[in-house]
Amino acid sequence: MTITAVSAIRKPVLAWPLAEPDWLIAAGAAMAMLVLVLFGPGFLDDGDTTWHLAAGQWMIQHVAVPHTDPFSFTFAGAPWQAHEWLSEVLMAAAFHLGGWTGVLVLFGLVLAGSAFLLTSRIGKSLTGISLLLAVVLALACAQPSLIARPHVLVLPLLIGWTAVLLNARASGRAPPFWAAGLMLLWANMHGSYVFGLLLLGVLGLEALIDAEPDQRLGVVRDWGAFAAATVLAAVVTPQGMAGLLFPFKLMSMTGLGNIAEWRASDFSKLGMFELSLLAVLFVCLSRGVKVPLLRLLLLLLLLHMSLQHARHVFVAAMVAALLLAPCVAQASGAVRVGARVNARPLTWLVAAVAALTLVGGRAAVATPRGDAPNTPQAALAHVPAWLRAKPVLNDYDFGGYLIFEGVRPFIDGRTDMYGDAFMARYAKIVSPDQAALDAAIRQYQIAWTILPPDSPVVAELDREPGWRRLYADKYAVVHVRQQDAPAIH
């Protein structure tokens, strides 16, 4: 059977009364993501979520994007690139409108839309069980990174941008100029936009290589014009040209190894990334899947990035699924040219009502926010207001929560601002290197500390005669200098 004949087969053997099965897979993926965010545990528990919210609140209050640090006491006034400013404003607006429930609804709708968009695009190539497995593997790989932070808000842009470029290659034309608007949003929301530029370069070069000799000048003209518009859009940010260099500066920092998400992927225990990788290898090897050379090199780069830094699995899973789907379909002899996942209006209505019901159910019940590993709520509540105003030595993961509560931290998740030297010094302080700890206490006039119970500094301060415990629970221990202790009752 020819590819044309196969692509003409649009309807399944068993007709569904309201929608194609593929549309139901897309809708099911969207609903699953919505439920996971709205009702699943831990989505709000990341230590950076709170400082992103605080940054957004600051920008709304001042109607400006900060260029210096307004939060910490160690780097107050130091240069800071708020490169995720638009995401932070959206997060703060959602929090203002609906509290923590508003934040969950924002991210839930974004992830639901992303899942539907991803499934719809893959559904142009795969169908049925193949489509379901591809989507499940991609979303399962991304699951550890699904937290309330800006990189999740740009997921629809990542998927949409990749889809636009692949559509352009399939149609033999340059991408439409309106797509540069996606880059404008992306560059103001998260630093991963540089990968979008890389993807454009790879597929643009592929278009040039694949073109007939007499058509290459036109390819250079059309793709070059779009690339110029895209780069121009990417520098329309508060940071301008410096914003293009920021992601590379961040990834070159040696201190990233101290942060869990920047460490190498862990294969000591079987996880979804390893399972997905093995599944993809099995399918590609068993079916003789052929991937165009430049796309193969791009996939290898994605794999390298994911092995080197666990946080890149999120991007790799989405892009790899979109790149490999047509290759797998062609190897299976089931190319669906121009296929779409669709549904009748009544089905859309039912899906919309279901989504609204889920959102309403979440809004009807207050979102619980109590103590968590990154939010020492009870511990901070026991610190008097006058003591909060004094310099504190805090755990790295507590910094965001302190900012959110109006306390100036010693350190927080803005690693790019603090730099390698300060990060290395902090690692010594909390190891603890006694000399480094004593020097920091003297230099910054540390009056209190808030650290996890298993921090070596906690045991050290317990032995120090000049310090005493103010409060302790399973999440945090607060120490106060003895000279301030008499004022606390």
Where in this protein do the model-derived segments appear?
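Transmembrane-helix motifs of polytopic, lipid-linked glycan transferases
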Residues: 105-124
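Short acidic/glycine- and proline-prone juxtamembrane loop motifs at membrane-interface regions
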Residues: 145-153
